[in-house]
Amino acid sequence: MLVAIEGIDGAGKTTLARSLALKLRGVGLETVVSKEPTNGPWGMLLRQSAATGRFSPEEEVDVLLRDRRQHVEDLIVPMIGRGAVVILDRYFPSMVAYQGAAGLPVDALLEANAFAPRPDVLLLLDVPPAIGLQRIWERGSTPNHFETTENLSRCRDIFLALELPSKRVIDATANAETVLSAALALVMEVLRVRLGALGAVVLRRLAG
């Protein structure tokens, strides 16, 4: 099962990914948390670009796709194949939103990611840019060149407009516990179908 957590910077993706994984592991489900960009060589290049603005949008797309292909081949597909729940802190919709906000065609970006497995659940944590930026400052970070009100507004609009069948929007202006409860309810819907009789046992544990 593949769960992707998306949203603009400061939406609470990393917090939710960790909390959700703890819940699922607590009921005996093998759960892996990963992120994009990854910590691999391509991902490190992307982080350097995010800090310095060195790459053009087209160059970033090329490196993002290289990073994602390696991620899919080395972790996502193998872990799903063994029955684990994979939780991703960002996935291909982030590339579509951020590079789309930089002026690249959204349809072409989606097509370039056709190789990437589609999430069973895509949790879009929605917050206004002002709140996202406030949270970035509160955690002691300095916003990078992507993290401006104007750019995050464009990214948010693209995230909300994306037509992906598994997308579910969560109001992430709420506290972390409320967001986790909403996310868990959506994940449980898929688990109920995926796990059958075993799912009933797991769901009772999660509900407890």
Curated annotation (Swiss-Prot):
Keywords per UniProt: ATP-binding, Kinase, Nucleotide biosynthesis, Nucleotide-binding, Transferase
Domain of life assignment: Bacteria
Molecular function via GO: ATP binding; dTMP kinase activity
Reactions catalysed according to its record: dTMP + ATP = dTDP + ADP
GO CC terms in record: cytosol
Binding-site list for ATP: 7-14
E.C. no: 2.7.4.9
Keyword Nucleotide-binding applies: yes
Alphabetical list of InterPro entries matching this protein: P-loop_NTPase (IPR027417), Thymidylate_kin-like_dom (IPR039430), Thymidylate_kinase (IPR018094)
PANTHER family attached to this UniProt entry: THYMIDYLATE KINASE, UMP-CMP KINASE 2, MITOCHONDRIAL
Function per UniProt: Phosphorylation of dTMP to form dTDP in both de novo and salvage pathways of dTTP synthesis.
Protein name as annotated: Thymidylate kinase
Organism, as annotated: Xylella fastidiosa (strain 9a5c)
